Curated annotation (Swiss-Prot):
This is Semaphorin-3C. Keywords: Developmental protein, Differentiation, Disulfide bond, Glycoprotein, Immunoglobulin domain, Neurogenesis, Secreted, Signal. Residues 28-511 form the Sema domain. PANTHER family: SEMAPHORIN, SEMAPHORIN-3C. It is found in: Secreted. GO terms for molecular function: chemorepellent activity; neuropilin binding; semaphorin receptor binding. The gene is SEMA3C. InterPro entries: Ig-like_dom, Ig-like_dom_sf, Ig-like_fold, Ig_I-set, Ig_sub, PSI, Semap_dom, Semap_dom_sf. Binds to plexin family members and plays an important role in the regulation of developmental processes. Required for normal cardiovascular development during embryogenesis. Functions as attractant for growing axons, and thereby plays an important role in axon growth and axon guidance. Glycans are attached at N81, N123, N252, N268, N465, N585, N586. The lineage of its organism: Eukaryota, Metazoa, Chordata, Craniata, Vertebrata.
Amino acid sequence: MAFRTICVLVGVFICSICVKGSSQPQARVYLTFDELRETKTSEYFSLSHHPLDYRILLMDEDQDRIYVGSKDHILSLNINNISQEALSVFWPASTIKVEECKMAGKDPTHGCGNFVRVIQTFNRTHLYVCGSGAFSPVCTYLNRGRRSEDQVFMIDSKCESGKGRCSFNPNVNTVSVMINEELFSGMYIDFMGTDAAIFRSLTKRNAVRTDQHNSKWLSEPMFVDAHVIPDGTDPNDAKVYFFFKEKLTDNNRSTKQIHSMIARICPNDTGGLRSLVNKWTTFLKARLVCSVTDEDGPETHFDELEDVFLLETDNPRTTLVYGIFTTSSSVFKGSAVCVYHLSDIQTVFNGPFAHKEGPNHQLISYQGRIPYPRPGTCPGGAFTPNMRTTKEFPDDVVTFIRNHPLMYNSIYPIHKRPLIVRIGTDYKYTKIAVDRVNAADGRYHVLFLGTDRGTVQKVVVLPTNNSVSGELILEELEVFKNHAPITTMKISSKKQQLYVSSNEGVSQVSLHRCHIYGTACADCCLARDPYCAWDGHSCSRFYPTGKRRSRRQDVRHGNPLTQCRGFNLKAYRNAAEIVQYGVKNNTTFLECAPKSPQASIKWLLQKDKDRRKEVKLNERIIATSQGLLIRSVQGSDQGLYHCIATENSFKQTIAKINFKVLDSEMVAVVTDKWSPWTWASSVRALPFHPKDIMGAFSHSEMQMINQYCKDTRQQHQQGDESQKMRGDYGKLKALINSRKSRNRRNQLPES
């Protein structure tokens, strides 16, 4: 029965390997939630065992706090350790609003609560906070104190309407930025969720929004993110960029397609004087493309923008915009990461405008006269120093913006292809954060990619010779135990920490765990982690300012042969030899699991003192990711097996297994229905002398039986030791008699 169970498990194991086998790259290190906690490089926070839809909405590195919104709660967590010194404010929706929400047919659990979706810094002492308010948005001011040591965290003002500042539906994303105590938001402004707007509120000036119900401006948008980005040296030329995806009808107006878009407005826009009153007069948008071009020409688009990260530099024009995209097709599923130069984005907004012409409303480049100042220009900036406000714009400029908000050219990524593509995986990317790391052999971008399965992949971008960047998955970490999709992610390069949220809670993870790679120079070098280097004693954090020349690191090639000379490389050529026994005609498994799934495995077999030869794989001998499966063991399988792993042209012996084959009849007689741990105590009850047993087997056979029984005994230490030995004495006696006669005929003189 046990053997049958083993066979079934082995079959399932093989099938799982076949199913999971894919050309998609795998993480070099995978840590489960519990394994990650054991490394002492992560922390976890949750208010309760019930899901509360946590969102990390603001990170303040000056006050060492991160601010989290959840259902009915506002949280202030310690940026150094989120599980310590947590502050919270209970801020539920009013009972009346909750009852009205339920009567309107909304979800009592996931809709009829106050889901906090906006937390922005208002001034040195207060935050501005908004929540969905059970489909009746509310906002308030929250006192956080002047210093983090004050331990102040409370609402000290009355609530006000959040309409135009936060979406009614908590499942519809709200994005926002705060500039000079003015709130710029992208959200849906009504209960039914039909009026989308980019809105400026909380202002001493007039409130301004996008043109209402104008599909040229916004067409069922789903907002993703918003950022303030400088444009030149004049601060008046800065723009607020909104990233979103929207549903657009094709030329036949029959089907809707999802396109990812970037829109921008000037923060000092006060609307038009006669047209577009209290509407944006600087609103422009452009399509954001992330696609793979097939060999025969057509493009495969990753249409749906999921998240955006801006990797800033000293020069704003060299800022990189990272975006995560997924496919909208039900047949073709995948994720991609595309990277854009901010200068390319600004070039598109300074380029030709789109214009629909002809009966099919075909988009063409606008060929008419462009009014002055150029539509989309900010008042009071470098190009319009004499215009203090948009109300001074000529009417033709305002009219042009209303009818031509779309740019003709699309925005393409660097090299016009994605940096990372994942197809046919059981996950999709949801969030992204990027860190710039200085290593011994150059500067690298390290991507942290959150998935819908509660994991974070740590990916390093590697330069190649043909202007195409490669990528290597260094780690995949289970940051949430129940595989909850990641909803928000913030990174602190200053603290070297990553903060991740899900429906269940918030996790904090260090950007590096150098000690997990191994205790040898080669292990550290093969990891190719730009955060880590071999310091002569261990794999530890690499600091580019260090003066020690013994630091060994090779991110680009990961070659221990050039980096680890003098650090006991010969130890990798040999592994400790172990003895393993198999029973003839049964199935056995020779275990060999390399540290890295990116390593290739080769099995070599050495019989007696012959040369090692590569094991020939077939239906009986199967190589798996965990070792070598030998079905129906034969005598010819006996020998010394070498498991050789090759990674980056570096070879090392992972395992040496001296495999010995036992006769099935002999093992059956000795072990069938016999408890191995009571053999010695029960041998006196046998109807023959113990010397008869010793003489029935050769010396080598007895050694193998002893070792086999020892191994079996260790596997059954937890069994029932009170069970007495039982067996077929007649069968054993017959075997002993036959072995006696055979041994007398083949007896060799003792040396």
